[in-house]
Amino acid sequence: MQINIVPEFKNDRDIDAVKSIINNCVHCGFCTATCPTYQMLGDELDGPRGRIYLMKQMVEGAPVTEKTQNHLDRCLTCRNCESTCPSGVRYGRLVDVGRRYVDERVVRPLSQRVQRWLMRETLSRRGIFSFLLGVGRSVRPFLPATLKKKIQLAPSAGQWPAATHKTKMLLHVGCVQPALMPNVDAATARVFDKLGVELVIASDAECCGAIRQHLNDHHGAEDQMKRNIDAWWPHVENGLDTIVINASGCGVMIKDYAEILAHDPAYADKAKRISAMAKDVSEIMPTYAAQIGTLAQNKRQSATPERVTYHPPCTLQHGQKIRGSVETLLSGLGVTVRLCQDSHLCCGSAGTYSILQPALSQELLGRKLTNILKTEPQEIVSGNVGCINHLQSGTDVPVRHWIELIDRMI
């Protein structure tokens, strides 16, 4: 797809990437077959190919309107299209930049600007989010049903391991998960402890930057990325070489630090190192599969469910291209693991999407849960805090992180 950039965009730092990505698109349309919003709305402009046309027209000088903004807003950034594309079009990177271009040229209504500011300043700040979540939980009985389902009561985190080990890895804890689901980090730490690995938390590390990045506050996102690098770097210099991530939405973001900060001479090399160190917990566990199997056999936990349905997060299967490792690990422990029909499709959480596009998000949730419940699971497991919370809001079947299942078994 040839492209002729107008002078207005030629000096933008991301325009070379935009041009390269658009040039790779051969407009074959394979992406539309797996795009959730195209399937729901049936509009070419609500599929990846149509959105690429809109972004191409924009940088070639076509007027940028609310119509362009709305079609890009409705994209989940699930990156299912990237898994389908035979040409390797990096659509997720393109739409992030395209949204920034649009927001720099189309002023949003005041209500949208306020909503997005509130999300940026609360969800991405651990202390503020924790406080507000506590307030929400205290008034939960009086909240509307849809909001009540989103604000679950605080789960018990259990004991954090006190032992120290020679082998150490960093654990990224992020912004939302410590308050919303502290049990996930604690379970992760216990599993690694039993495997002889101590997880270290850098106290000054914060949100990975994904929330601000996807809400088009790219400068704010990059500031958070740099602060994280600064927080982790002393540990890197002390020999730690792995950052364990148990929220795949954070993982896909941290793995992109290298590209996003490539323009910054003070951080480019460090960002490249950090991205290489970032590992989803599902990338690490297979190394310890035999040890986990022995521990599980010795414990013989009768409370372990016999049948679970695994929902692979989009940020894991499409964003990080990690597939099959969770199912293989759990199956090796004797758990019957099922995938539902259309397991490649998004559940509708998609970070802040469930807040910004509630109708589309709820339709996707309904479709996903209909397919999941057909598998008759005793538990539903996933690997991302947003997916877990979103799925749990629509069903009484327990939804947990799969690492919690491992924690119970060993």
Q: Where are each of the predicted segments found?
A:
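Non-heme iron-sulfur electron-transfer modules
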Residues: 1-10, 37-70, 88-117, 400-406
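Iron-sulfur cluster-binding electron-transfer modules in prokaryotic oxidoreductases
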Residues: 14, 91-410
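Generic N-terminal leader/targeting and pre-domain segments
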Residues: 1-28
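Short His/Asp/Glu-rich catalytic/ion-coordination signatures at enzyme active sites or charged loops
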Residues: 60, 84, 216
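N-terminal glycine-rich anion-binding loops that anchor highly charged ligand groups
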Residues: 29-33, 43-47, 199-201
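Cysteine-centered iron-sulfur cluster-binding motifs in ferredoxin-type domains/subunits
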Residues: 19-38, 69-89, 315, 344-345
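N-terminal, well-ordered alpha-helical segments
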Residues: 33, 53-57, 70-73, 79, ...
